[in-house]
Amino acid sequence: MTIATNRPDGWPRATTVGYVNDGLTIYFLCSPQSQKAANLARDSRVSLTIDHDVSDPMAITGLSMATEAQPVIDPSEVAKAMNLLGTRYPEYMSLPMPKPEEIAVYRVLPKVISILDYSKEFGHSDLVTV
């Protein structure tokens, strides 16, 4: 997933993150000292995309969303997100687990979703408001 946050100078900053979803709720994590975390502390608005690279432009599909990223503070929800991430990315389980203070977990609940499907027409998207 690529997530764009707003830098202090007003320019968007897009970065790739691992993510997991539970229904429409999306979780991702980052370092609390990262530029992403600093940007989110100042402005919680984000845009994100979930897609995959294809060689045929008419095969482009994906999701583009506008929403806000909220820090997850409740320890049980943090544990839930970490368990979901471990299920989605089992290779993570062989790595040393970070201490709670070494990670920041965020929750995203989409407000506006563009569903991209270029097989219908070049540039086609359906807009859904949640």
Q: Language-model segments: which ranges?
A:
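Short beta-strand segments
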Residues: 1-32, 40, 47-52, 61-62
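Short N-terminal helix-initiation segments at or just after the protein's N-terminus
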Residues: 7-15, 45-56, 90-95, 102-105
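Acidic-enriched, low-complexity/disordered segments with a strong bias for Aspartate over Glutamate
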Residues: 9, 22, 43, 51-56, ...
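Structural motif
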Residues: 25, 45, 112-114
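Alpha-helix boundary recognition
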Residues: 41-42, 86
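Charged, gly/pro-rich active-site loop segments
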Residues: 57-130
